[in-house]
Amino acid sequence: MHRYPQTKYVSLGVPTWLYGHEPSTPLATHIAKYFVNSVREDTILTIAFGGIIYTPGSAGTLREIFQNAVQNHYLSFGIASPRVCMGKQFWTEDVPVYPMIHQMEERGRYKNLLLTLSDDPIEIETVLKDFQKTIPYE
């Protein structure tokens, strides 16, 4: 952050206390720590109205994907936030969550998912920025 300071946006990095391999992001303007990972995950999903990018992960990442799918489906907080699965091979072949969720949405089992699959950082940025244009700010 010292090399590339910015004051336009505020962001929050929330690595879990439990897993040492999840370091804080150097790009966040603020850092928080939770001692209970499930509380951390729920908090992140609750406040992430601007979107979430899922990179290849393990059990916790899968839980977050489905937790957020439920929040978006029911519009639990009055808004559905965009979600991007980054890593086409991982999310379609290694851990084929994307095709399953996409099919459930097409069949009407899930709604409001706003789910994108991409390997392209520019496309991902565009998806998130385009969503920001639709949010009515007071």
Predicted regions and their residues:
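Acidic/glycine-enriched connector segments
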Residues: 1-54
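Glycine- and other small-residue-rich loops at beta-strand/loop junctions that grip anionic moieties
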Residues: 33, 54-57, 86, 116
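Short, acidic/small-residue loops that bind anionic groups at enzyme active sites
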Residues: 1-16, 55-56, 62, 69-94, ...
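A short secondary-structure junction signal
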Residues: 24-26, 63-67
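A generic secondary-structure signal
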Residues: 43, 71-74, 103
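C-terminal functional extensions of proteins
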Residues: 81-138
